[in-house]
């Protein structure tokens, strides 16, 4: 039984290996594909256009941030920086934050952090955060 209060993540791994050819000078290519599949229960389906990623909270900890995800959805964070441009193209190790959990990331500290994530449509929106007392919240657009 899958949880009904949060998304569940599955990976579909596919390896395509062509049959051995008896012809000389043949180029054969083996492909491996990994697809992420998300099961989203009816109980948590959001209206189209709803932005739940702005509920993320950044906590200043150690030599970076702890990204807290209080939502029932997986969120893939692909950038964190001091400006929107740095967040979109800077050096950052991509992390996927599971529903109702948190993950630690190494990063410089910023007065106004910007975070880039991947939405349901493959877009890469940027969130601006404001920090108070080591806790950073996304500003509503």
Regions found by a protein language model. Give the residues of each.
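Generic structural detector for well-ordered beta-strands
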Residues: 36-38, 57-59, 66, 96, ...
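Asparagine-centered strand-capping/turn motif at beta-strand->loop junctions
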Residues: 65-71
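Intrinsically disordered, low-complexity Pro/Gly/Ser/Thr-rich segments with frequent PxxP/GP/PP motifs
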Residues: 1-2, 86-114
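Low-complexity, acidic Ser/Thr/Pro/Gly-rich terminal tails and inter-domain linkers that flank the onset
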Residues: 42-60
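Terminal connector regions
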Residues: 2-40, 112-141
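Short acidic/proline- and small/hydrophobic-mixed sequence motifs that coincide with surface turns
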Residues: 72-77
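Residues that act as N-cap/strand-start positions at coil-to-secondary-structure junctions
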Residues: 31, 50-52, 61, 89, ...
């Amino acid at each position: 039984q899958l949880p009904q209060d949060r998304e569940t993540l599955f990976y579909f791994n596919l390896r395509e290996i062509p049959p051995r050819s008896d012809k000389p000078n043949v180029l054969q290519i083996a492909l491996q594909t990994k697809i992420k599949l998300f099961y989203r229960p009816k109980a948590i389906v959001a209206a189209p256009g709803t932005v739940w990623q702005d509920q993320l909270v950044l906590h200043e900890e150690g030599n970076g941030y702890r990204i807290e995800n209080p939502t029932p959805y997986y969120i893939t964070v692909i950038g964190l920086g001091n400006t929107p441009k740095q967040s979109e193209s800077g050096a950052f190790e991509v992390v996927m934050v599971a529903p109702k959990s948190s993950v630690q990331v190494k990063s410089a500290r910023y007065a106004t952090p910007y975070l880039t994530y991947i939405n349901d449509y493959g877009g890469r929106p940027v969130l601006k955060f404001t920090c108070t007392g080591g806790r950073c919240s996304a500003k509503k657009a």
